[in-house]
Every structure is written in structure tokens, then in C-alpha cells.
Amino acid sequence: MRNYDLSPLLRQWIGFDKLANALQTAGESQSFPPYNIEKSDDNHYRITLALAGFRQEDLDIQLEGTRLVVKGTPQQPEKETTWLHQGLVSQAFSLSFTLADNMEVSGATFTNGLLHIDLTRNEPEQIAPQRIAISERPALNS
């Protein structure tokens, strides 16, 4: 029997919390760049990517249907550097996230090497749960 670790895929499905929580396993692998996904309430999320060494001009964010794609291509230094130790990675990347229906990108900011992408869920009224009022009705006479 084979066990497949779906957690790397589930982390990138934003707005599918119940599915992600039900299927996520203990082993978590992370690719470059490191990122966090925060949930402030049922309708507001934030993706934060750590992008040390990148400039705002090096980054591109696109929304293709329900697929959010973040790409980065850092400028290469003009002269070759000899590293004694290189702990900071600055390489080109493309990272995509699958958003749930009715999720919208409400904004993006790049401050101190952190790219913040804010997401909002906008449920149409016909999809949102509706409260039905219960009225008192006279009893039926038999």
C-alpha cells in the first residue's frame, strides 16, 4: 500500500479549510520561497512570502481564474562573488496557489523583504446562509 503526502498541495488551497484540515498529514515539506498563510477570520486571509534580496520590480503577481501565481526573478550581480558562506538564497521562482470560489485579491504590499498578499472571500447573497424567521401560527382545530 502506498501513502501519498498531500499536505504540500493542500497548503496552497486557500479557502478550502475544512478539506485541508481533514486531509493534511504531519509531514510538511516547503519549497522556495518560504511562505505563511494566515486566516484572520472566515472571509480574510493573508499570504506572506519571505523574499530577502528581491526588489519590488523583480516580482509579478497574476490571478488566472482561481489560480494565483507569484513569480520572482532577482537581478544578478554584475560582478562574480566568492562566498565563504551563502545562507541567503536569491533565485528565480514561480509559486501558485489555488483559491476557492469567490476569493478575491484585495491588495499586495512589499515591505522589508516580505510580500503580503491579502485575500477576501465575497459570498454572493444567494450562496450565503439565510436565516428563516419562525412565526407563531394558531393551532389547527380538529
From Swiss-Prot:
InterPro entries noted in UniProt: A-crystallin/Hsp20_dom, ACD_IbpA/B, HSP20-like_chaperone, HSP20_IbpB
Record-level GO BP terms: protein stabilization
Alphabetized SUPFAM superfamilies for the sequence: HSP20-like chaperones (SSF49764)
GO terms for cellular component: cytoplasm
Record has Cytoplasm as a keyword: yes
Record's keyword annotation contains Ligase: no
Location(s), subcellular: Cytoplasm
PROSITE patterns for the chain: SHSP (PS01031)
Pfam families linked to this entry: HSP20
Recorded domain comment: The N- and C-terminal flexible termini are involved in oligomerization and in the binding of non-native substrate proteins, and are essential for chaperone activity.
Assembly and oligomerization: Homodimer. Forms homomultimers of about 100-150 subunits at optimal growth temperatures. Conformation changes to oligomers at high temperatures or high ionic concentrations. The decrease in size of the multimers is accompanied by an increase in chaperone activity.
Job description of the protein: Associates with aggregated proteins, together with IbpA, to stabilize and protect them from irreversible denaturation and extensive proteolysis during heat shock and oxidative stress. Aggregated proteins bound to the IbpAB complex are more efficiently refolded and reactivated by the ATP-dependent chaperone systems ClpB and DnaK/DnaJ/GrpE. Its activity is ATP-independent.
UniProt name for this protein: Small heat shock protein IbpB
Protein's gene: ibpB
